[in-house]
Amino acid sequence: MSQNTLKVNELHEDADFDENSTETEIFDEKALVEDEPTESELAEDELLAQGVTSGADATQLYLGEIGYSPLLTAEEEVYFARRALRGDVPSRRRMIESNLRLVVKIARRYSNRGLALLDLIEEGNLGLIRAVEKFDPERGFRFSTYATWWIRQTIERAIMNQTRTIRLPIHIVKELNVYLRTARELSHKLDHEPSAEEIAEQLDKPVDDVSRMLRLNERITSVDTPLGGDSEKALLDILSDENENGPEDTTQDDDMKQSIVKWLFELNAKQREVLARRFGLLGYEAATLEDVGREIGLTRERVRQIQVEGLRRLREILQAQGLSIEALFRE
């Protein structure tokens, strides 16, 4: 992506949002105030902008462009926001440029999720623009509180649309989003990540339903990474729900699973156990990273690392036998 695509005057302004749903969102300033840039983070950005860190990459160049726009005071926000709502272009630009570092801060939290940092920033900038267009200063909260929600939405939507190879039915996506949004809201109020029981209580839903959807979300997030080569498919693609397939498709899926099981035994014992427990093979029920770690006495991060190593080794085994990843799939 070109450096110039991130300049404010070249950003697209027609991001696709469902405004009917977003208008009903409740923005909690106390819950989101942590997303405002801290002094240390702003100092870090300024050092990057000045090229203090080694290697003047595109991120540093971009930070150099935005690093000298001062943050607005609360009074200035109200002044410029009112003028922006009346169509004053310079005020709108001032609102955007003064909050570009907020986008960078939030975008950094989504690193290693399938998109480069500059791509995340560009998506977040679209959310910032929309926030400026819709911000009502008379409602009494700071602009950064309001903008944070829009920035998150555009970044998360981009990650979902550009990195997922699994497409869920729309009613499942909507239900899952309700649970995830509730989990985020609770995490701001509590001093820990909410459990399935706490989410279920908040929504007055059965705990089993919430647990099932949260497991589904983790499997999609961690398993939908392409296995490699020329294939865009992932391991979860071939472990499909038999209830959604016809008899012929079910037979093909069974053959695929048997092939995977055979190659699993060419991995080392730890890789084989982790993959089997994660994806419901060798008699195990599919489990989350946390559950697998609990069962075998490892941290969640170590389980994830072993999973990545195992999938990489599985690809090497296939290639050594003259097979491609596509050999596991039949349309």
UniProtKB/Swiss-Prot annotation:
Keywords, alphabetical: Cytoplasm, DNA-binding, Sigma factor, Transcription, Transcription regulation
Q: Which InterPro entries match?
A: RNA_pol_sigma-70_dom (IPR014284), RNA_pol_sigma70 (IPR000943), RNA_pol_sigma70_r1_2 (IPR009042), RNA_pol_sigma70_r2 (IPR007627), RNA_pol_sigma70_r3 (IPR007624), RNA_pol_sigma70_r4 (IPR007630), RNA_pol_sigma_r2 (IPR013325), RNA_pol_sigma_r3/r4-like (IPR013324)
A Pfam family that this protein carries is Sigma70_r1_2
Localization, per the record, is: Cytoplasm
Region annotation Disordered: where it falls in the sequence: 1-25
Residue numbers of motif Interaction with polymerase core subunit RpoC? 119-122
Q: Where is the composition biased (Acidic residues)?
A: 15-25
Does the record's keyword annotation contain Transferase?
Answer: no
Q: What are the start and end residues of every segment in region (Sigma-70 factor domain-3)? A: 175-250
Q: Which residues bind DNA?
A: 289-308
Q: Cross-referenced PANTHER family, in alphabetical order?
A: RNA POLYMERASE SIGMA FACTOR RPO (PTHR30603), RNA POLYMERASE SIGMA FACTOR RPOS (PTHR30603:SF67)
Q: How does it assemble?
A: Interacts with the RNA polymerase core enzyme.
Please state which protein family the record places this protein in. Answer: Belongs to the sigma-70 factor family. RpoS subfamily.
Q: Tell me the function of this protein.
A: Sigma factors are initiation factors that promote the attachment of RNA polymerase to specific initiation sites and are then released. This sigma factor is the master transcriptional regulator of the stationary phase and the general stress response. Required for the normal expression of the enterotoxin, yst, in the stationary phase.
Q: Would you tell me the protein name for this molecule? A: RNA polymerase sigma factor RpoS
Protein source organism:
Yersinia enterocolitica
